């Protein structure tokens, strides 16, 4: 599972790109779990987006800090399902 911190307002063309960089270097990409929806985010491009989803949890404490607790809770629920 991968998570990343970014600022979609200041860096909409590279939002949470670090997640994508890590993902690309993994030898077993098919083992990555915890993909999340891109819904509710406003960005132009992200290396962390694959097939319309983020490859993990994208957190934006600069522009949407109020949404972080709910996003974390949803992500943990996804992870629990994928590991059980």
Language-model regions: role of each:
Residues 1-84:
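FMN-binding flavodoxin-like domain, especially the glycine-rich phosphate-binding loop
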């Amino acid at each position: 599972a991968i998570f990343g911190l970014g600022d979609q307002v200041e860096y909409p063309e590279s939002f949470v790109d670090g997640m994508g960089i890590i993902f690309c270097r993994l030898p077993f990409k098919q083992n990555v779990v915890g993909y999340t929806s891109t819904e509710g985010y406003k960005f132009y491009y992200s290396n962390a987006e694959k097939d319309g989803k983020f490859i993990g949890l994208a957190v934006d404490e600069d522009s949407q800090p109020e949404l972080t607790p709910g996003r974390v809770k949803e992500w943990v629920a996804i992870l629990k399902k994928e590991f059980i």
